[in-house]
Amino acid sequence: MRTAKLLAILLPFTCAGQTFLSAVSAAPPQVVRESPDRAQNGLALSAGSGDPRTTSTDWPGFLGPHRNGKSDEHGLPNAWPPKGLPVVWQQAVGTGYSAPAISNGQLFHFSRTKDSAQLKCLNAETGAEQWTCEYPSNFVDMLGYNNGPRATPVVDGPNVYTFGAEGVLQCVRIADGHPAWRLDTTKQFNVVTKFLGVGSTPLVWHDLLLVNVGGSPPGGPPDVYWANGAVDSNGSAIVAFDKATGAVRWQTGNDLASYSSPVVAKINGRDTVFMLARNNLLAIDPEKGQTIAQFPWRARKLESVNASTPVVAGDEIFVSETYEVGSAVVRFDSAKFTEVWTDRNRRRNQAMALHWNTPIELDGYLYGSSGYHAPEAELRCVEWKTGKLMWSEPGMTRSSLLLVDGKLVCLSEDGTLRILKPSPQKYEELAKWEYGVGEGEETRCSAALCAQAFHQQLVLVIQHRR
């Protein structure tokens, strides 16, 4: 099979029955293959155009190589074949909301099968399984969503890291699929059970693995409902583990865990880690392991969560949530945060209210899916410097975005994949594809965790079989 560009997209499902992770081509096909393994839940793949302008780029974890949803690859077409995008291969996976990670021709997918959390390593071109690393998991979602992992695998050199819904953090050797180390952060840091388990993807920074842990002092409440949200912190909002051994190097932040993932940016010549925790946006010095500043940002509702990952542009940071306070842009001067604009206490409608998705920043504008429930969700464009709403497009259900070759790749919960031309003037759709299924099948994802990955123009789609 000729190497071709791969657009990898994962749609998580919650309905009962079988699920298949499918990989399909984002460009006209050359070769179509199918894996013989079509077990209970699955993954499928198709070949792309093999555009000679394309340079293959790994997608080693959540939001891609730069952790901002932007790909370095080129050659994404403006239109797709009238009959849609063909399937290349299909592979069984378990339940969960984890996106795929892709590196050196290997695809890593983390899911739950019965009482086992499973990290699978697949050949990205053929879907053939190379190994599976698993451990027991008894996590049960408090709100009735599925019990699989939420965080995306992180590939770093010879290792891949996972963070399970129950709080198990592990380092797995890519060469043989065996764990180099494994630990339970829930037990080690006394993490009080929260609504949806662990949902933050760790960040590799030099020789450290930075993790959104959010533990509490011993003897605390059994869960957030029992305590009516009054849960103390033990100073482990973010914990730095030695990525080679799992030893704790430092911990900082008097806050609890969120479903947002940390990012790192260079501000005034120094690396700063930004993490939207349960109650605050934190600025952290990763060299000293100290919290520099915090900016309060959380809705008053007990069940509210901070889940969108901060977006950094220059010395400014965008944060958002969907339950009450909406969005804000703050400026960080290496010592403190200063508001640029905020939705909080605005009389007009909020600029953006992001639930699970992280927006794309491009040329001074933000593009993201605003809305709590699928029926009310709409795609929006907002001016970065003012929060001014430029346009909104309803009726798309909740969606996630990537920026590829100057175009937006938009994946919606209902399984619709679109290519959009980014413009602050108006919504402009270049291509649209609804993933086709056979009789007795449906394609949809839930909780707006329609995570995507881009590598060599193959599309990964989850297909549910009733």
Predicted regions and their residues:
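Noncatalytic, solvent-exposed loop/strand surfaces
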Residues: Q18-R466
